[in-house]
């Protein structure tokens, strides 16, 4: 929630001093589609998670302050990447730490002093890879998709389709999968 580590620490100290719970709600982690996919992962339906991919792209923010790096703290990575990383952490496991991170970012379209496109990879201590794609230059509305690949299957979550949940498994997946799914 802070623009940098110092601001985040300042907020954490204020929360501790006030003896309250602090945080932010990552709402996409609580949608029915996501909860269904997370339950399938936890049940072992796709085996061991080896790779997650989260994409959040759109033409850019509505609020002017987002475009100002001094006010927002950065570009599309700080705006959208935080959501994608949290999606991956839910699938991979919140107690599993990243050990290596790399990112490519560039300003391609908007005349701003921050990135408007980025791709990042995080390798976790269990060998899983988390990938994010974020953009403020995507044309075609908003694109919000998540994938989780395991040793025994794959789940695709498209947050803008009616059903928007597909699972392919060679493991434990014989239960009800999605509303109006066709065989």
Residue ranges with predicted function:
Residues 142-143, 171-173, 179-180:
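Active-site lid/adjacent beta-loop-alpha segment flanking the redox-cofactor pocket in flavoenzymes
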Residues 5-8, 34-35, 114, 145:
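Conserved strand-to-helix beginnings and helix N-cap segments that scaffold or border functional pockets
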Residues 8, 127, 177-183:
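C-terminal helical cap and adjacent loop that interface with cofactors, partners, or active-site loops
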Residues 20-23, 28-112:
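Predominantly a Rossmann-like dinucleotide-binding segment in NAD(P)-dependent oxidoreductases
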Residues 1-4, 27, 57, 135:
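Active-site beta-loop-alpha junctions enriched in small/polar residues
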Residues 10-13, 39, 119:
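Alpha-helical scaffolding segments of alpha/beta enzyme cores, especially the outer helices
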Residues 86-169:
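Contiguous beta-strand/loop segments that form the cofactor/metal-binding neighborhood of enzyme cores
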Residues 2-20:
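Rossmann-fold NAD(P)-binding glycine/threonine-rich loop
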